Curated annotation (Swiss-Prot):
Belongs to the acyl carrier protein (ACP) family. Residues 1-76 form the Carrier domain. The lineage of its organism: Bacteria, Thermotogati, Deinococcota, Deinococci, Deinococcales. This is Acyl carrier protein. Keywords: Cytoplasm, Fatty acid biosynthesis, Fatty acid metabolism, Lipid biosynthesis, Lipid metabolism, Phosphopantetheine, Phosphoprotein. NCBIfam families: acyl_carrier, PRK00982.1-2, PRK00982.1-4, PRK00982.1-5. It comes from Deinococcus radiodurans (strain ATCC 13939 / DSM 20539 / JCM 16871 / CCUG 27074 / LMG 4051 / NBRC 15346 / NCIMB 9279 / VKM B-1422 / R1). GO terms for biological process: lipid A biosynthetic process.
Length: 76
């Protein structure tokens, strides 16, 4: 099972944001300032960290930290 802290570590690494800004409700683009390339890198980082494949269709729906945690928990 993915934990919030593990997902947060990937986000901090890939987006270079302060970990205090990474909350379950935080949106990658609007709140954490990710651009389209960073969003792709974030998804790839999550795939590598958790050993899951996130298809493009699913990646487009993952907009918040909690959505990423939920997707990983449900697909690991």
């Amino acid at each position: 099972m993915a934990t919030f802290d593990d997902v947060k570590d990937v986000i901090v690494d890939k987006l270079g944001v302060d970990e205090g800004k990474v909350t379950p409700e935080a949106r990658f683009v609007e709140d954490l300032g990710a651009d389209s390339l960073e969003t792709v890198e974030l998804i790839m980082g999550l795939e590598d960290k958790f050993g899951v494949t996130i298809p493009d269709e699913a990646a487009e729906t993952i907009r918040t930290v909690q959505a990423a945690v939920d997707y990983i928990d449900n697909n690991q």
